[in-house]
Amino acid sequence: MTESEQIVYISCIEEVRYSFVSHLSKALQRKGVNDVFIDSDDSLSNESQSMVERARVSVMILPGNRTVSLDKLVKVLDCQKNKDQVVVPVLYGVRSSETEWLSALDSKGFSSVHHSRKECSDSQLVKETVRDVYEKLFYMERIGIYSKLLEIEKMINKQPLDIRCVGIWGMPGIGKTTLAKAVFDQMSGEFDAHCFIEDYTKAIQEKGVYCLLEEQFLKENAGASGTVTKLSLLRDRLNNKRVLVVLDDVRSPLVVESFLGGFDWFGPKSLIIITSKDKSVFRLCRVNQIYEVQGLNEKEALQLFSLCASIDDMAEQNLHEVSMKVIKYANGHPLALNLYGRELMGKKRPPEMEIAFLKLKECPPAIFVDAIKSSYDTLNDREKNIFLDIACFFQGENVDYVMQLLEGCGFFPHVGIDVLVEKSLVTISENRVRMHNLIQDVGRQIINRETRQTKRRSRLWEPCSIKYLLEDKEQNENEEQKTTFERAQVPEEIEGMFLDTSNLSFDIKHVAFDNMLNLRLFKIYSSNPEVHHVNNFLKGSLSSLPNVLRLLHWENYPLQFLPQNFDPIHLVEINMPYSQLKKLWGGTKDLEMLKTIRLCHSQQLVDIDDLLKAQNLEVVDLQGCTRLQSFPATGQLLHLRVVNLSGCTEIKSFPEIPPNIETLNLQGTGIIELPLSIVKPNYRELLNLLAEIPGLSGVSNLEQSDLKPLTSLMKISTSYQNPGKLSCLELNDCSRLRSLPNMVNLELLKALDLSGCSELETIQGFPRNLKELYLVGTAVRQVPQLPQSLEFFNAHGCVSLKSIRLDFKKLPVHYTFSNCFDLSPQVVNDFLVQAMANVIAKHIPRERHVTGFSQKTVQRSSRDSQQELNKTLAFSFCAPSHANQNSKLDLQPGSSSMTRLDPSWRNTLVGFAMLVQVAFSEGYCDDTDFGISCVCKWKNKEGHSHRREINLHCWALGKAVERDHTFVFFDVNMRPDTDEGNDPDIWADLVVFEFFPVNKQRKPLNDSCTVTRCGVRLITAVNCNTSIENISPVLSLDPMEVSGNEDEEVLRVRYAGLQEIYKALFLYIAGLFNDEDVGLVAPLIANIIDMDVSYGLKVLAYRSLIRVSSNGEIVMHYLLRQMGKEILHTESKKTDKLVDNIQSSMIATKEIEITRSKSRRKNNKEKRVVCVVDRGSRSSDLWVWRKYGQKPIKSSPYPRSYYRCASSKGCFARKQVERSRTDPNVSVITYISEHNHPFPTLRNTLAGSTRSSSSKCSDVTTSASSTVSQDKEGPDKSHLPSSPASPPYAAMVVKEEDMEQWDNMEFDVDVEEDTFIPELFPEDTFADMDKLEENSQTMFLSRRSSGGNMEAQGKNSSDDREVNLPSKILNR
């Protein structure tokens, strides 16, 4: 960004020019924005107009009491539209009621408007505005910085609250300074003093230590002036202060020590941040926390490059391919993307941009060259040679291969490569040496500079230059002489030469290498994998090769021998595939340093006895040497590790094996007799091999036998005595092998592969330390006892397998029984039960089995165990799906499963068991691997969304699947770990699991297979020994509020997966029977719906649609109830009879009266009758009632009213009236005890009471009208006389004081009872209770009948009575 682009234009009125705006300007300058232009004039002057046009960001201070200059506003908006200028509006002094500015800004698309508010001070408004301006001004520099900022803040916060030190490390231009500035801007306000010294090494060289200290600390922070004479003065002033110091681009630890003095003179909680491209700086400064800055990802890189190159959306499509080449070359390097983007700006056609980019690659940016050259100059000669060799020849090569060659050159690469890594010049990734493309080009430019200065080049890699040196000019004397390469090149100076002959064809002259006395590395190859030979030819012979050669790599070497005068005393590797060699050389040569011989597909080779002189030989690769008849006895080659003789068809016998050999490949040889440890040759066409392999003689140190099929092998001998060091045994595709002996003596055997042994029926026993077992496609019916060490078991396609012995302590971590159709479901269940116990035992400390996860217990867990825990799943399993499996495992239809986790489970939480059923299309055969991707989504209590995705690998490619399969995965990585800083409440909320099949590239397999059912189980230390189908899924839906469209959609998906009969049950509960007792609801619904209600409730509970409380009540979350009612309302227009029935039931005017008689109620307790009525259809019970009290109810803002019968003096009947907790439109009346007198007469009815039939126990109406209330037992009234069973009622004489005592006792007991009622739905609110009590002294319950809407009102207000008039009498 140029200087003019950093201008910030501020438009304001004069009243705020020296108040708010001055603070804003000063804050911007503190952030490094020095070009701030403030315009407070009413009119737009020429200078103001110029600044508006040049500014990158315009801040418009819009007042509430004055108008703004329309000229300035129009000009700013015009620049925003035509020049991509950023406008930041600030409403200052605008009251909330003044919405004109907000409406106008909203219409213009301003999504971010800063507004002064009563609760927001001016300082806070300044802070918000500055942050917004800064981010918009330096937008490109901020790309990709946020995620890095979070990571480094987390690293800082983990350090103890002493003086904290953090290093930021990375290659030049990767963004170290930008990240340090972001941290400084973010955290500087938390410190008493702070300073950021950019390019620290240069600053301290120019100003000196004392001047720099005075400039950064004393003048600004302590208010002192003058020269620092005593360092102790500064230390005293900063001793107890929290100080933030950022030293950028430090190249030497000594200058840090002189400036900071060991960091010990700052106050506690101070923070020192050092950025450097040299990791050794941090080590010498004792900075242990080091953050390595990575490059931008592809999306961020494309975004930055498009901005810098000014590529709009239309041009992006045309230039996308070229842009991706630039991005791939830059490899996420921000500085390179910025520089290349600006250089390529204006190139609108792909060919034009590509040509310009190729020119830029030839000459890297000077700023980057200087930075790399400065690091290069600090290296010693050996390290420089290593750097140049990697830049020219070894980019992306195996690190061991590079180490071996450079070690042979005497460069001590084990030390040198570490130095290059610390200086950010190379990296080691996936065991390969990596160098950024820019650094590689700079390294090669250093070589080219040598040519310009001395006319000499030490390393050659350009094909045209090498061709000019090697080509036989006599054969091409008529060709035009090449001028691209200097003829003054001195062959004696050449140390390395790598020639790619993919597009070349020429003749190499006879004396091409005579003068190359220092040539260490020589390689002729073809980079085109489709070309199997190199187009170069030698006419006659080759006179010589340099004796200092360490690497001789010559593909398709055309001669039968190497030059006789070549002395390979320094040779480390011979790699000559597809050569015409018959023998390496005649006579005896000293091969002391030779470690690798690769002569693959040298079909003329007949003798290899020369390798016996290579005492340090490690690798021999003679694959495809079809004329080679013998392999020498290599027993004395103590370092030999790898021998590959595959395809050597003329080799009939194999000699003594070296003691330390690790890998032996005899595939396709003619060997007919081998020890068991070598196993078999691979020659599919050879049918007369021995049917029995003899014992293990002389092979005690063989560690791996990587051999392919021996189709005629029928039996393995048991006569061996010495098991040796055999660690891997592969017998795959031995189609005639029928049995396998007991191999318990092979104690070091770790892997056994019997895949493809289609006739194998019997296995006697396995080695006790076996870790991997493959029985794919065998005919085994019963697997013997598995070893306790087994971790991986694959029995895919074992169609005859019926049982597996389960008398073992633990199971493999991963095992597959796909296409094992005869395997019983009980065996599958036993495996799952045992696997859960393994998870508990392996991943939970012993104390947690009883006491749960205490903090001390977690702290006692070893760090290594936790790291191992995060690497893999705890358990995975695959088997064919069975018909009755869905009901046992309770898999819900669909590919998603929703659960809610109770916070109390965290103490015993182990992980999750995820069960997925996958349907495969007919003829499915996977050729890209198969796995299942699990996406887990959740929200915490604050409503923040989280997401985690894990990919569960199921099997390798080539597996044909014939029917549906069930996959089970136990994941222990998802459990919260407070030691790692995770939010402990994160798993207390709604969690959604989504599953879909993927291939090896994690792309969905939509057409060939689909997830049909799934389920999730919570595994705790409590249920670890429980059968998988008896483990309840995570149920609790009510502990906290659920909200959001995403959650509602998940609930609807869960409902949609139900069968129709269970949908009906769900809707009845949502509309009618929430908070009701299961024993009451089950028989009632059974009369309405022909179903097993108990099982249906269990189905809904498993799907987390309801919960059955400890006292037997059905509980449904309010969001689910609301969803059910919406479904009824939405479906009401359809002809579905079920929906019509439920809809009509919810608005019906009939009354439900249900007599509850619980078996647990004692005989001396009064019966209760509950009447539930709709507020729009109130009912009558014929009696006259007097209100004697009311009290608040926990979990409800409204009271409960208490009434006693006033129809007859001395009656014990009582009732309670309250609002339903689930539906505010429903009133709940609870009758306690029975009346001891006849019904009122008609005369009394006219005076305030009515006559009717007894309401003791009304018939249950099958068409329910509304939700039934909670069932509560009445208080113990054993001291009272019992009510008569039926009229006529006996007259009783009761004293008035006894009645009052009874009322008070009932009220007190009820208060105590409600004190312990749990708050199930704190979010539910009831309607105004005053609407229920329409008169302060009289309560009327009315109802609406089908014939019309009629209400009855009681007129007796003098005695505090409530008159209930039934609709039957009113309808008369």
From Swiss-Prot:
Localization terms from the record: Nucleus
SUPFAM superfamilies referenced in this protein's UniProt entry, alphabetically: L domain-like, P-loop containing nucleoside triphosphate hydrolases, Toll/Interleukin receptor TIR domain, Winged helix' DNA-binding domain, WRKY DNA-binding domain
Chain positions recorded as ATP binding sites: 170-177
DNA-binding region: 1174-1240
Composition skew (Low complexity), residue ranges: 1249-1269
Domain notes for this protein: The TIR domain is a signaling domain involved in cell death induction. It is involved in heterodimerization of RPS4B with RRS1B, but other domains also contribute to the interaction.
Protein name per Swiss-Prot or TrEMBL: Disease resistance protein RRS1B
